[in-house]
Design a protein with these regions (language model features):
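N-terminal secretory targeting signals
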Residues: 1-89, 93-99, 214-218
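Catalytic glycan-binding domains that act on GlcNAc-containing polysaccharides
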Residues: 59, 66-218
């Protein structure tokens, strides 16, 4: 079994996946800092050059193209399973098949926590970006649940934009990218969400995501 899972990566790398991202951003800001949505929210996200340290950190956080959901221990599995069960009813209309629904929620919990994000925030972002549609494509080409722009697969992935339609791959990219933007914006969620959507500094998109997030809080 492939052990390069989100929690396994944290173990192998000494729990430094999130630390790498923050440290890399801080290092870049000390020098020269080089730093999507459903049809209604197709952002104008622009590919920006990344410093080598940031690119390396993001690539390490992404890991393999199609990660396997392998929990580090029973407690972590139970935590995400319990969270998923508690929210299944709310997702029933969007994902009527029980196994698909549960796998989706567990994956969101898993990847969000790996990136140091609130799972409910990730659900809110997915709701606004794609309406929970796995194969959503925006007018600017953003793909999947978290509307990942294809250039990210070339910049920090395997170069195959089709892989962004794989559920866990897409959610992992989205969580890692949002974590990166939070680090760039020094923890300012409003600005990070705007950067994610390509509408940095404007209120409408961040307000929609945070409103959707409230609907997923237990």
């Amino acid at each position: 079994m492939d052990t390069l899972s989100p929690f396994a990566v944290d173990r192998r790398l000494g729990g430094r996946v999130r630390t790498w991202l923050s440290a890399a951003v801080c290092a870049v800001s000390a020098g020269v800092c080089a730093v999507v949505s459903g049809a209604a929210w197709a952002g104008a996200q622009v590919e920006e050059p990344l410093a080598d340290s940031v690119r390396t950190a993001l690539s390490a956080a992404i890991g393999r193209t199609e990660p396997v959901l392998v929990f580090a221990d029973a407690a972590q599995r139970q935590q995400c399973e319990g969270w998923a069960v508690s929210l299944e009813a709310k997702l029933l209309k969007r994902k009527p098949e029980e196994l698909v629904r549960r796998e989706f929620l567990q994956t969101v919990c898993y990847e969000a926590k790996r990136a140091g994000l609130e799972p409910g925030l990730v659900l809110g972002l997915i709701q606004v970006e794609s309406g929970f549609r796995k194969y959503a494509i925006s007018s600017v080409g953003a793909r999947g649940y978290m509307q990942i722009m294809p250039f990210w697969s070339r910049t920090i992935g395997n170069g195959d934009p089709a892989s962004l339609f794989h559920m866990q791959t897409n959610i992992r990219f989205g969580c890692v990218i949002l974590r990166h933007y939070l680090d760039v914006e020094r923890g300012n969620l409003f600005m990070a969400l705007g950067r994610y959507n390509g509408s940095r500094g404007r209120a409408e998109y961040p307000n929609m995501v945070t409103a959707a997030w409230r609907g997923w809080k237990l």
